[in-house]
Amino acid sequence: MTKYTFKPKDFKAFNVEGLDARMEALNEYIRPQLHELGEYFSDFFTSQTGETFYPHVAKHARRSVNAPKDTWVAFATSKRGYKMLPHFQIGMFEDQLFVMFGIMHEAKDKATRAKVFERKFKAIQQLPDDYRVCLDHMKPDKPFIKDLTDDDLKEAIQRAINVKKGEFFIARAITPQDKRLKSDKAFIAFLEETFDQFLPFYSA
């Protein structure tokens, strides 16, 4: 019995039609692991940074018609919420599990906070080849950093700094069939390795 990881069939929760039915599927197949990951990694971030982190599992409470296309657990230093702060995420769409760190368009002092990515531009470019960026957390698209030109990357960061709706995340994503989802041990190792790469951007 696994505690943290997801099986390919768990991702099929996103194929269930209708808001109530899909929420039921998420509650059965995905949210239990998100809560466990929330406990594990809030402790992980607290020990790594010396700041107290809190987990926030997506509730999708505002939805009244459209079923969610993704779900997640986010980690931030506020008990009340994460959207206003730089935060870490573990989440899923039907075809990917993603891990991210960055700043949403709702972030407080977004222009100032996003400048960390400007300052650490070289460090972004030096991330391993399978690392990506996400410029809109609502969409599954996450281009590989290695496929972006310097100008593409600079423009994306500037958009997060200067445009109200702009946001910027560094990310990693794997498919539902990925071998790193086959066991809790492999999955946690993958997540810790990813967050170890993200943490210098948080503490900068």
From Swiss-Prot:
The UniProt similarity line reads: Belongs to the UPF0637 family.
InterPro entries in the record: UPF0637, UPF0637_domain_sf
**Listed disulfide bonds for this chain?**
none
User: What is the annotated signal peptide range for this record?
Assistant: none
Recorded protein name is: UPF0637 protein SA0957
